[in-house]
UniProtKB/Swiss-Prot annotation:
Matching PROSITE patterns: TUBULIN
Tissues showing expression: Expressed in intestine, pharyngeal muscle cells, and a subset of neurons.
GO biological process per UniProt: centrosome localization; embryo development ending in birth or egg hatching; establishment of mitotic spindle orientation; microtubule cytoskeleton organization; mitotic cell cycle; protein localization; regulation of cytokinesis
Region spans: Disordered: 428-448
Role description: Tubulin is the major constituent of microtubules, a cylinder consisting of laterally associated linear protofilaments composed of alpha- and beta-tubulin heterodimers. Microtubules grow by the addition of GTP-tubulin dimers to the microtubule end, where a stabilizing cap forms. Below the cap, tubulin dimers are in GDP-bound state, owing to GTPase activity of alpha-tubulin. Required for the normal dynamic behavior of the non-centrosomal microtubules in the epidermal syncytium. Involved in the redistribution of microtubule end-binding protein EB1/ebp-2 caused by wounding.
CDD domains with a match to the protein in the record: alpha_tubulin
Keyword hit for GTP-binding: yes
Name of this chain's protein: Tubulin alpha-2 chain
Annotated PANTHER family: TUBULIN (PTHR11588)
Gene designation per UniProt: tba-2
Length: 448
């Protein structure tokens, strides 16, 4: 089997994990206590990539929840799905990382890391052919940034060749949950850059807007946001959990989306996200949903791909979709002038089709639709997101604001400068990748 272990770190990671596993269970007909009613025996058993079978008719998620403080994980321990997870898969510390990368990475995180790696080792031993790890976390929090980067470093040591995909919550441009988010984000990006194979970014503000605009939710809660994020995660992982016409496996994402090791931050878009009232009046053909993927309104990160160039696009369809319609839709997109590809990657479309229609959480905001598409695109526009973050970092760091909290936890000030330089290099990498290849052919050689 090609198993995947999901690791949910910090409050954001754990709450997204909650939403994802709720959705997986609905998709596979697994009850909240892990049993599967006998009549719905799955043919193909593909879902065992994410669930392990205990042999006594119970299915346990191959996942781990880690937080440096207990309150968020306690909600799972006492919630609807408390019987689904093995109690050993919930690991919590006593004191939290206090939005401080250094606490998550050095002081508080150090005490938990060995327990976590031990549990991961047990899950890995239970797999016959472990394919890789899916790590969910936020950039802004102390645990999400600091502990994740520590974990990724250690996973590289223990499981060198296994792929590691990240699902990161990027700090929203307007809505901030912590003053030091820019510090944490840049430190964690710098540390995990060489350890992560592919990182899907999602920013809360973009999803707030989707909730308000498409779902008519006036004041979205984290539950609303996480249910949308879980649909995206579900689309990305659907091909590992179901049998489809064009299946995409973990390594295939990387092969098709990552042209250079550092340029591994695809932009996610998902359509259709509409409320039940609207769905009733819309047709939503394959070409409709494919086109709307290219609209900035449906993207999970605030940036404008019309200002950037696409390097690669991966379209993951699910539901009632036939390849012929997809080809027609893609051909139409290629003729549009607004959608530009870099000149060294002319074709650039990878397609996955899965016949399992999208599932929605009963009583949620999303309408049940016959087909949906998730688009993962590697575009130079995402550099906008980095430059925004770098700018905020610079404003604070010029005054050395809040730096003493990090240094007090055993970090050196040099790490800030080093991380900031690495991100400047990343912005430059994006710039060079987007530049036309016929300009300045001299200095090509030494970059990679």
């Amino acid at each position: 089997m090609r198993e995947v272990i999901s690791i949910h770190v910090g409050q954001a990671g754990v709450q997204i994990g909650n939403a994802c596993w709720e959705l997986y269970c609905l998709e596979h007909g697994i009850q909240p206590d892990g049993t599967m009613p006998t009549q719905s025996t799955n043919e193909g058993e593909s879902f065992t990539t994410f669930f392990s079978d205990t042999g006594s008719g119970r299915y346990v998620p191959r996942s781990i929840f880690v937080d440096l403080e207990p309150t968020v994980v306690d909600e799972i321990r006492t919630g609807t799905y408390k019987k689904l997870f093995h109690p050993e898969q919930m690991i919590t510390g006593k004191e939290d990382a206090a939005n401080n990368y250094a606490r998550g990475h050095y002081t508080v995180g150090k005490e938990l890391i060995d327990t976590v790696l031990d549990r991961i080792r047990r899950l890995a031993d239970n797999c016959s052919g472990l394919q890789g790890f899916f790590v969910f976390h936020s950039f802004g929090g102390g645990t999400g940034s600091g502990f994740t980067s520590l974990l990724m470093e250690r996973l590289s040591v223990d499981y060198g060749k296994k792929s590691k995909l990240e699902f990161s919550i990027y700090p929203a441009p307007q809505v901030s949950t912590a003053v030091v988010e820019p510090y944490n984000s840049i430190l964690t990006t710098h540390t995990t850059l060489e350890h992560s194979d592919c990182a899907f970014m999602v920013d809360n503000e973009a999803i707030y807007d989707i909730c308000r605009r498409n779902l008519d939710v006036e004041r979205p809660s984290y539950t609303n946001l996480n249910r949308i994020i879980s649909q995206v995660v579900s689309s990305i992982t659907a091909s590992l959990r179901f049998d489809g016409a064009l299946n995409v496996d973990l390594n295939e994402f990387q092969t098709n989306l990552v042209p250079y090791p550092r340029i591994h931050f695809p932009l996610a878009a998902y359509t259709p996200l509409i409320s039940a009232e609207k769905a009733y009046h819309e047709a939503l053909s394959v070409s409709d949903i494919t086109n709307s993927c290219f609209e900035p309104a449906n993207q999970m990160v605030k940036c404008d791909p019309r200002h950037g160039k696409y390097m690669a696009v991966c379209l993951l369809y699910r539901g009632d979709v036939v390849p012929k319609d997809v080809n027609t839709a893609i051909a139409a997109i290629k003729t549009k002038r607004t959608i530009q590809f870099v000149d060294w990657c002319p074709t650039g479309f990878k397609v996955g089709i899965n016949y399992q229609p999208p599932t929605v959480v009963p009583g949620g905001d999303l309408a049940k639709v016959p087909r949906a598409v998730c688009m993962l695109s590697n575009t130079t526009a995402i550099a906008e997101a980095w430059s925004r973050l770098d700018y905020k970092f610079d404003l604070m760091y010029a005054k050395r604001a809040f730096v003493h909290w990090y240094v007090g936890e055993g970090m050196e000030e040099g790490e800030f400068t080093e991380a900031r330089e690495d991100l400047a290099a990343l912005e430059k990498d994006y710039e060079e990748v987007g530049a036309d290849s016929n300009e300045g052919g001299e200095e090509e050689g030494e970059e990679y």
